[in-house]
Amino acid sequence: KVGESNDRTIKGDSEYSWALQDISFDVKQGDIIGIIGKNGAGKSTLLKILSKVTGPSKGTIKSKGRIAALLEVGTGFHPELTGRENIFLNGTILGMTKKEVATKLDEIVEFAGVERYLDTPVKRYSSGMMVRLGFSVAAHLEPEILIVDEVLAVGDAEFQKKCIGKMSDVAKGGRTILFVSHNMGSVKALCNKGILLENGRKVFEGSVNDTIAKYVINKVDT
């Protein structure tokens, strides 16, 4: 549960503006929630707080289970380590043993399409390669909660479609997904619920179709 999660950004010398304010919602096991809104609505800040990358200035987050997040290009990767080493590093962070990660290694590498560069430091990867490997690691290491930001837009259309399919498979296993995207087609195809943010506040929560409709109406009105 997210209770009044807030994050502040400095505005001027002494004034503060809240990036998020008065947000509260429950996420149940197996929910696939699309979080939508215009640029600057607070979507990425919310995901950072839920992923525990950033702490809320006020309020609390209560969660159960392992959380894997893909928030930005290179999230969770050490640039000097190879792709292989980073896969094992991320598995360790999620509380997995080396043996558990090893059983997933081939599947992760094949999905990401980085076989030739597996033992190359990731600082030499292109942004597209980083995103492919980052998503593959997050999705295949079986977290209870998967959080994915708009970073998938860096990949090509074919890979984005592949990711939507994989997230759908993950969700069928009873896992929870929080997904931010400006691609309403992807949100509609994947999610069963939606949350609409506007100026750091939750202005609507409901079925994914109703949430998208509200978002479109708000865009037309402005």
Residue ranges and their predicted role:
Residues 1-22, 208-222:
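Pre-NBD coupling/linker segments of ABC/ABC-like ATPases
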Residues 189-196:
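Conserved catalytic segment of ABC-fold P-loop ATPases
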Residues 181-182:
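H-loop/switch region of ABC-family ATPase nucleotide-binding domains
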Residues 199-200, 215:
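Conserved ABC ATPase "signature" C-loop
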Residues 3-6, 88, 100-117:
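Conserved ABC ATPase "signature" region
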Residues 36-38:
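The feature captures the beta-strand-to-loop junction immediately N-terminal to the Walker
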